[in-house]
């Protein structure tokens, strides 16, 4: 099923700014700090290195588009992070009086925004720990300054690199100033999700998984759904400090060796709505749920298949009997799996054109299914055959995600491992 929303209603002027930025000769950002070989004063002998730098820039542009579609919070956090990195790069490479003055003027002009960036950065990733009053208030962390590469002016056209980097900073500032006006109440995508969770006869009372590719989006949804009165919410991503096993068992106790009563006896609340990044999209048993929501547009059908596989798995007859005995109201939906894909039909062509502009790849995403091409999610599709297309798509699990998944497998095989590691 498709859950429709409007990008225009959510972003307003920001969508126009993004399209304008993508239509520049160097789409969105020039990013010379990641592609210095394009500004080499000497012939580039290592074509592989130059191509690698070029690909990095392309991937960053694609990532920004994906995060823009995901949520305003995900796009904002990326803009803030890149702003800080580019500022650090410009600061360490501005060695002439003219360059230092130009950068200082930019900082003074954007003083109000930079203060807001520091404040918002703390809010976006606040884990409930109070801010340290002694915390450095400089928007550029010391470690970023230390990590920024200092370019050899004999080899690279540093003045041109700095000029284009300042243009990138201006573009980021334009986005961030517009995002300062953003309020969750204008988020049409969020409103569509809240409506779905409150009005669908199954979703409003049974377990559901909500997947997003991005941590900032997942955390934003957890906060806003709770504000909207949705009960039984939990959220997990690659940086979650709580025990991942506990999070999984609280959402899917029956398929992870527990029951609702066992959770209650341990004074652990049972989760009804679990919001997760793709760290939970592979290798886990979450069949207590039979409904799944994919909050982001599907640029990668292979990862979509992995997500669906978390709830659409082989059922254990004994576990099913126990689950239905304890929760008779779920009997009608057991054995069926439904999933929703969020899709902006009115602006889909614009988003896909922007994607093609920076990736040179054409995606054909169905307006009725919300997925790419004709390779997935129709009754006649062959899920096993889809694996043959794996090499065509990006988005394999990150090293961190793979390590987390392997850790969970080890815990399942060796129940005492967690206690031994903590000892």
Where are these regions (language model features)?
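Generic hydrophobic alpha-helical scaffold/packing signal
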Residues: 194, 305-308, 359
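C-terminal accessory region of SF2 helicases/translocases
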Residues: 315-423
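Conserved RecA-like P-loop NTPase helicase motor core
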Residues: 226-347
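A generic secondary-structure signal for well-formed alpha-helical elements
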Residues: 72, 76-79, 83-86, 90, ...
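Hydrophobic, Leu/Ile/Phe/Ala-enriched alpha-helical segments that form helix-helix packing faces
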Residues: 22, 197-200, 225, 251-255, ...
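Helicase motor interdomain insertion/brace
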Residues: 1-242, 252, 270, 277-284, ...
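A generic short-segment signal for beta-strand/edge and adjacent turn/coil regions
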Residues: 177-180, 202-204, 260-264, 308, ...
């Amino acid at each position: 099923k498709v859950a429709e929303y409007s990008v225009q209603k959510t972003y307003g002027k920001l969508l126009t700014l993004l399209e304008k930025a993508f239509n520049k000769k160097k789409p969105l950002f020039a990013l010379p700090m990641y592609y210095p070989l394009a500004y080499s004063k000497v012939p580039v002998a290592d074509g592989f290195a130059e191509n690698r730098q070029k690909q990095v820039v392309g991937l960053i542009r694609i990532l920004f588009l994906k995060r823009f579609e995901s949520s305003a919070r995900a796009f904002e956090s990326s803009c803030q992070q890149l702003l800080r990195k580019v500022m650090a790069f410009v600061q360490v490479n501005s060695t002439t009086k003219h360059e230092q003055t130009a950068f200082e003027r930019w900082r003074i002009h954007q003083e109000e925004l930079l203060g807001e960036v520091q404040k918002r950065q703390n809010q976006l990733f606040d884990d409930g720990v109070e801010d340290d009053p002694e915390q450095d208030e400089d928007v550029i962390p010391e470690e970023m300054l230390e990590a920024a590469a200092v370019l050899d002016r004999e080899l690279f056209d540093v003045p041109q690199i700095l000029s284009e980097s300042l243009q990138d900073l201006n573009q980021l500032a334009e986005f961030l100033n517009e995002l300062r006006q953003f309020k969750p109440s204008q988020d049409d995508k969020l409103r569509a999700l809240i409506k779905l969770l409150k009005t669908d006869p199954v979703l409003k009372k049974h377990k559901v998984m909500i997947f997003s590719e991005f941590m900032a989006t997942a955390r934003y949804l957890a906060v806003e759904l709770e504000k909207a009165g949705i009960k039984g919410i939990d959220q997990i991503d690659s940086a979650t400090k709580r025990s991942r096993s506990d999070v999984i068992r609280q959402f899917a106790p029956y398929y992870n060796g527990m029951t609702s009563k066992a959770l209650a006896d341990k004074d652990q609340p049972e989760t009804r709505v679990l919001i997760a990044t793709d760290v939970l999209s592979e290798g886990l048993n979450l069949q207590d749920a039979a409904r799944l929501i994919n909050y982001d547009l599907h640029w990668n059908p292979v990862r979509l298949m992995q997500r669906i596989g978390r709830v659409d798995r082989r059922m254990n007859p004994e576990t099913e009997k126990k689950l239905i005995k304890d929760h008779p109201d779920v009997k009608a939906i057991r054995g069926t799996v439904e999933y929703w894909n969020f899709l902006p039909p009115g602006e889909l062509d614009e988003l896909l054109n922007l994607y093609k502009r920076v990736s040179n790849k054409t995606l054909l995403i169905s307006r009725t299914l919300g997925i790419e091409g004709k390779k997935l999610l129709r009754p006649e599709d062959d899920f096993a055959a889809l694996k043959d297309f794996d090499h065509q798509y990006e988005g394999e699990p990150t090293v961190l995600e793979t390590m987390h998944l392997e850790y969970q497998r080890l815990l399942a095989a060796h129940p005492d491992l967690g206690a031994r590691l903590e000892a």
